[in-house]
Swiss-Prot record:
Chain's gene name: trpD
Entry protein name: Anthranilate phosphoribosyltransferase
GO biological process, one term: L-tryptophan biosynthetic process
Residues annotated as binding 5-phospho-alpha-D-ribose 1-diphosphate: 84, 87-88, 92, 94-97, 112-120, 124
Residues reported to bind anthranilate 2: 170
Domain of life of the organism encoding this protein: Bacteria
Length: 349
């Protein structure tokens, strides 16, 4: 690509199937975030990029630009995000959202970052609204809620106003774009620990690579069934990222004492139904949904512990999961998780 950054040089490079540098990728995304790019330029950029195939350096540049233009969310302590990319097309209940509440009930500060539905029957924002949480809070109130309760929700559209500049184009294109990858990587609080479920297998190296390049701590995972969660229907693959190193693991839920579930056991409906499922699980209802929630809450706790003490990576991952599954289960059975939800609802009112 030429030394002078312009849409012409960016598009010529992409059409020639040349990868962009971090700096050039960041320049292009800044044009989108600031509203300087036209709809035609955005559409050409997104399609040419998708046709070529994104690289880790490009995603790093895009992420840096998005976060540079995000509304800040100051945090005074270590925090965790539990999120899924969506796109698995199963329409499950809100597993990562429920797991986030359980993790907060276990005492870990959680900053959930999300948007409208992608693969669940209702997205994290939809089900949280149905649970009674006010999602229209200004950014400073979002931070206050975290300090008061230990959990909060950063609505992507509120903290990334620049996303709106590409919204119409994305809707008209109707195909997945780089923005589908960026969501889980752009929590405005920049939490130290992440647990990220990824549905498309070809997206895993990109997301893992971004965490690795930036020296972040994360557990990235997908079910062999295609879920963007740690699955209980069969094996899951886990990529553990810490201090620039990646360790791969295979997780069989049976090794953790969990019975094998059927995907039908995990399917959701609309936001009201899914909110009722969340409340039932937090109230102690047993069954397949509780099992998968406990497993995914444990993933968040494992990541948070690893961020605090990177030497934990040397310990067997199944041992770490067993330990944190017990913590997650206790958060439910003691009533701490459902109490955390009620605290959260009250704090947003």
């Amino acid at each position: 690509m030429s030394e002078t950054q312009s849409w012409s040089s960016v598009l010529i490079a992409l059409l020639a199937r040349e990868d962009l540098s971090v700096a050039d990728a960041s320049w292009a995304m800044r044009q989108v975030m600031t509203g300087e790019a036209t709809d035609a330029q955005i559409a050409a950029f997104l399609i040419a990029l998708r046709a070529k195939g994104e690289t880790v350096d490009e995603i790093v540049g895009f992420r840096d630009a998005v976060l540079d233009h995000a509304v800040g969310l100051p945090v005074n302590s270590m925090a965790l995000d539990i999120v899924g990319t969506g796109g698995d097309r199963f329409g499950t209940v809100n597993i990562s959202t429920t797991a986030a509440i359980v993790a907060a009930g276990a005492g870990v500060p959680v900053i959930k970052h999300g948007n409208r539905a992608a693969s669940s029957s209702s997205g994290s924002s939809d089900v949280l609204a149905a649970l009674g949480i006010d999602l229209t809070l200004p950014p400073e109130r979002v931070a206050e809620v975290l300090r008061a309760t230990g959990i909060t929700f950063a609505f992507a559209s509120a903290f990334h106003p620049g996303f709106a500049n590409a919204a119409a184009v994305r809707s008209q294109l109707g195909v997945p774009t780089v923005f589908n990858i960026l969501g889980p990587l752009c929590n405005p609080a920049r939490p130290e620990a992440s647990a990220v479920g990824v549905a498309p297998l070809d997206r895993v190296p990109l997301i893992v690579g971004v965490f690795q390049t930036r020296g972040a701590t994360a557990l990235v995972f997908r079910g062999d069934d295609g879920l963007d969660e740690l699955s209980t229907t069969g094996h899951s693959h886990v990529w553990e990222v810490s201090r620039g190193l990646v360790t791969e693991h295979d997780i069989d839920p049976r090794d953790l004492g969990l019975p094998t579930a059927q995907i039908e056991d995990l399917l959701g409906k609309d936001a009201a139904h899914n909110a009722a499922v969340v409340r039932a699980v937090l109230a102690g209802q047993e069954g397949p949904v509780r099992d998968i929630v406990v497993l995914n809450a444990a993933a968040g706790l494992v990541s948070y512990e690893l961020a605090a003490d990177p030497s934990r990576v040397q310990e067997p991952i199944l041992d770490r999961f067993r330990s944190h599954m017990a913590v997650a289960a206790e958060a439910i059975d003691s009533g701490a998780a459902v109490s955390k939800l009620e605290e959260w609802v009250a704090a947003t009112r």
